[in-house]
Regions:
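Basic, short loop/linker segments at the boundary and entry of helix-turn-helix/winged-helix-like folds
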Residues: 1-26, 42-46, 51, 69, ...
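Active-site proximal helix-loop segment of RNase H-like, two-metal nucleases, encompassing DDE(D)
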Residues: 169-185, 196-197, 201-203
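Mobile genetic element proteins and their domesticated derivatives, centered on retroelements
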Residues: 20, 34, 50, 80-81, ...
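Active-site beta-loop-alpha junctions of metal-dependent nucleic acid enzymes
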Residues: 56, 107-129
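Two-metal-ion RNase H-like nuclease active-site motif
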Residues: 73-87
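C-terminal domain-tail junction helix/linker
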Residues: 190-225
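Short conserved beta-strand segments at catalytic cores or DNA/RNA-binding microdomains
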Residues: 28, 88-104, 122-125
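DNA-recognition alpha helix
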Residues: 30-43
């Protein structure tokens, strides 16, 4: 039995829809700015259409990318960090797990930054991705308490600069947050954090290790996959 294409009832080609969604999630652009960029390339759409496409296909494209990512390996090292996000005046925390190659593994939103929240986040990440060899964190006491309960306290590595990889992974999210003029609901934050991280991984090449031509070619390939 053949499955129905998710683009069946759309007049615009799947390539244009994918391009618009990738532009919006990858770069700190507004819906109107994506509309203007596509208009300059001969594609006449409304900014509300871009919004609809992101809502409809953002998670789908992220899911396709997630299926093709590398799985667990023996010398895996994770970096954990959290950043606060304000929603309607209330402070929430976006927890993030990043591996030693800079790939974002998991994002999780909580109201608090205590032991229970850290434990819930770590269990969720380990169930999905397996158990790492080393887990690098900052000196937040919640991590140590959660690790002791789970039984992985011997794998924790605390340090300032050693956790820069995870802290740097927050930067694209912060730029995107400013462009969106903050999030309105926790569900919107969790949803966007999840698919933004997958698309970030998809385009996250080691630019300093490659020639300009190779880097640009890989970026073009990633955009069309």
């Amino acid at each position: 039995m053949t499955t129905c294409s998710p683009f069946k009832y759309f007049k615009t080609s799947p390539e244009i829809i994918r391009l618009a969604v990738m532009y919006y999630i990858r770069y700190p652009l507004s819906f109107r700015q994506v509309e203007d960029i596509l208009h300059e390339r001969g594609v006449d759409i409304c900014h509300e259409t871009v919004r609809f496409w992101v809502e409809r296909f953002g998670s789908k494209f992220a899911g396709e990318i997630r299926k093709n990512r590398a799985g667990h390996h023996s010398n895996w090292q994770w970096h954990l960090d959290e950043v606060f996000v304000k929603i309607n005046g209330e402070r929430f925390y976006l927890w993030r797990a990043v591996d030693h190659e800079g790939e974002v593994l998991e994002c999780f939103v909580t109201k608090r930054r205590n032991k229970a929240a850290a434990k819930k986040f770590l269990i969720k990440a380990m169930r999905k991705h397996g158990s790492p060899k080393i887990i690098t964190t900052d000196k937040l006491p919640s991590y140590g308490a959660a690790f002791r309960e789970i039984g992985v306290a011997d794998r924790q590595l605390c340090g300032g600069r050693s956790n820069n990889r995870c802290e740097n992974s927050h930067l694209p999210f912060r730029r995107r947050e400013r462009a969106m003029q903050r999030f309105k609901t926790v569900a919107a934050l969790q949803k966007f954090g999840s698919y933004q991280s997958q698309i970030y991984n998809h385009f996250n090449h080691q630019r300093h290790l490659e020639s300009r031509q190779s880097f640009k070619q890989k970026g073009t390939t990633a955009l069309t996959e």
